[in-house]
Amino acid sequence: MRWKHKLVYVEWVDASQPVPEWHFFSEIEAGVPVPCRSVGWVHTYNKDILMILPAVTGMDTEHRSGMGSMTIPRSAIRSITAIEIEENYNGNT
């Protein structure tokens, strides 16, 4: 599937948050990957990364703009699902 400019739902895993205190190695417990879910319009999809934007405007013009870009390593992605949207919005884009 060609993903460029598609709205997608992504399930991926991230590193768990670092523990801020010092501990002896013998006291440290293994963390677990954190399951994450994100929704956004695809800006970049290649062999290394998926970049999505949660907010976009002007998608039908040469002045496309987006904010809040998130880059997810492809190795962290568990699934990508295209979201179909109805294109009958009556306001400005």
Q: Residues of each region from the PLM?
A:
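Conserved RNA-binding domains used in RNP assembly and mRNA/RNA metabolism
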Residues: M1-T93
